Amino acid sequence: MDLFFGLSLIFGYLAGSISSAIIVCKLFSLPDPRTLGSNNPGATNVHRIGGKLAGFLTLVGDFLKTALPMVLVYKLDYGREASLWVGVMTVIGHCFPIYFGFKGGKGVASMITVVALVISPFAILIIGSWLLTLYTFGRSSIASIVTSLIIPFFGYHFKPELFVPLCALSVVVLIRHWSNVVDLLKDE
């Protein structure tokens, strides 16, 4: 690993630590998303709190903060796997932001952005599986958990060499959904 790639990983984490949800809520004079609704600083909760536009802008912000570091590394000829690792770091930053006491969002939008940028056709399957699971069970948490679990396996089918970073990506999002897993098990 050279110095630039190491710095790119740090930059990815710091970019991911920027909370689009908190910024959008401040711009729209909305309550802090960490204190209302699901208490999660993510696009879904901002949509609940502030409506479609606020939720959409949060989603766009999450996409941009994830995509920009990844595209930069890729354009500098570090390759797909390096770009994926930078994407993993942006998701870690989103979920555990240094600027907000390591209490961030669940990372689903950022995770899907990473997958879409690295393996575009694969993203259609991932988004489709998320939507199908949401439609079937009616809970976004279940859709996010199922999607996180299948990402490494679908990814292995398309790009076996990316299996390890895709596993890392999934583990980060599953860690942030652990309380949802516990709640789902209690309901059964």
Briefly describe each language-model feature range.
Residues 4, 8, 12, 17, ...:
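Alpha-helical transmembrane segments in multi-pass membrane proteins
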Residues 21, 70-71, 135, 152-157, ...:
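Membrane-embedded alpha-helical segments of multi-pass transporters/permeases
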Residues 47-50, 73-76, 93, 108-137, ...:
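Interfacial segments of multi-pass membrane proteins
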Residues 124, 140-147, 158-172:
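Loop-to-transmembrane alpha-helix initiation sites
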